[in-house]
Amino acid sequence: MKKYYAESELIINSDGSIFHLHVKPEQLADKVILVGDPGRVALVASHFDTQECEIESREFKTITGTYKGKRITVVSTGIGCDNIDIVMNELDALSNIDFGTRYEKDNLRPLQLVRIGTCGGLQPYTPVGTYICSEKSIGFDGLLNFYAGRNEACDLKFEQAFVDYMGWEGNVCIAHPYVIDADKELVNRIAQDDMVRGVTIAAGGFFGPQGRELRIPLADPRQNEKIEKFEYEGYRITNFEMESSALAGLARLMGHKAMTVCMVIANRLIKEADTGYKNSIDGLIKKVLERL
């Protein structure tokens, strides 16, 4: 029996668009690029051959158009896994729920989603300017723990090895990390020889959760030192960002394909940073557009 989605659960605006994004079902392409910064949406769309719609609501900006015959939607998510929860659920609803009847569609429509972002490198081989594909993500955010099917989707052995190594077992103050794979086919298509594949930590904040200490001391001053040295079955943690785990995890549970690729704009180990990255990230955008 198909599930009915009440008005309180699936909020549809009076114009037929989804609540936060303000996008209508017919405005969503099968191929989706996600960016954090609303200003980066225009940069991606500047490469489109045609443009059919442009919508802006809060931090969520959406443009749908075509690139070399491929219909693509680019959406800004803002910062953090909490926003990814909003964006992914609303994109999935646009794709797989009939807004007229409020029932799930008979034929589900899988999306291909690539997040293009920036990150902090954690290894000597990930200097500023490196493109890192998140083959696996470790979620510090705890978001996926609220959804059924979490254990079946995640790499539980990797999770336990990481928790044991960090000394976090039994620490009720920390959301239990989850480890999730990006879609392998999408990774193989996007992450070619010009990109590093690695394990990404999606942190729940920019400062303390990523080991940055300003006026408040860290609960674990050795956090980053331990993270940089962690290894499991040949995997090393390559970078910090704030969205990849929720994207890969929710996509897996919903039946979509998703991955994250980021440009390193700061290396925490080498202690270098580039604040003028906004021009150079265009090269990464072009690569994703060609391969998506």
Feature map (PLM): residue ranges:
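Metabolite-binding pocket within alpha/beta catalytic cores that recognizes anionic/polar moieties
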Residues: M1-Y178
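Intrinsically disordered, low-complexity segments enriched in small residues
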Residues: H20-Q27, G204-Q210, D282-R291
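Short glycine-rich, acidic/polar surface loops and turns
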Residues: F240-H256, V261
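Structural signal for hydrophobic packing residues in well-ordered secondary-structure cores
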Residues: F48-E52, D92-S95, F99, I190-D194, ...
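His/Asp/Glu-rich mid-to-C-terminal helical/loop segments that flank catalytic regions of hydrolases
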Residues: N267-L292
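Glycine-rich beta-alpha junction loops
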Residues: G120, S137, I201-G208, A246, ...
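Short pre-catalytic strand/loop immediately N-terminal to key active-site residues, enriched for Gly-Thr
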Residues: G234-T238
